């Protein structure tokens, strides 16, 4: 790494050769956090959201959400969020390109959410995590492949979707195309 940095034409990169064991950019969350892939296939009905502990270093191919709030996990794991990504987010080939700036920061969340409604979303989000734990032998990409998604995970996401949709409307949306 030292030689690589010394061979650069960029003065800041050359300076970093003094500490070859350090990352160029070190912005790590101080608490546990969530991650979302930068690029996801368009075949998925949901974007897989992962939890990382604060001592884990995420790949540059992941978007870091500096929160471990299960309510936020529920919102991000919902079909409503996937529809938002389809409308607002970027595209990459046949899939989605997730951007914290475009997809996460602009996702509309109702201002007034009752305690009961928030608890319901959290409960359903925990149901998604529990359903994922039942299939620990599967990679997350396979869990969210429509052809392989376990029935329990699909059901847990459907229940979460209903809870999230109730935050926005008294009736459930019939057509949620991303």
Label every model-predicted segment.
Residues 1-178:
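S-adenosyl-L-methionine
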């Amino acid at each position: 790494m030292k030689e690589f940095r010394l061979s650069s034409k960029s003065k800041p990169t050359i300076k970093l050769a003094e500490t070859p064991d350090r990352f160029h950019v070190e912005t790590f969350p101080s608490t546990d956090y969530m991650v979302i892939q930068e690029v996801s296939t368009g075949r998925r009905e949901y974007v897989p959201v992962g939890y990382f502990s604060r001592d884990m270093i995420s790949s540059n191919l992941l978007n870091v959400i500096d929160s471990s709030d299960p309510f936020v996990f529920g919102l991000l794991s919902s079909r409503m969020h996937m529809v938002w990504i389809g409308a607002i987010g970027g595209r990459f080939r046949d899939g989605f390109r997730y951007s914290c700036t475009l997809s996460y920061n602009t996702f509309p969340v109702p201002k007034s959410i009752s305690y009961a409604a928030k608890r319901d979303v959290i409960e359903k989000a925990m149901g998604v995590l529990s359903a994922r734990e039942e299939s620990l032998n599967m990679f997350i990409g396979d869990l969210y492949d429509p052809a392989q998604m376990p029935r329990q995970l699909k059901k847990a996401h459907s229940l979460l979707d209903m809870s999230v949709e109730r935050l926005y409307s008294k009736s459930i949306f019939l057509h949620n195309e991303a």
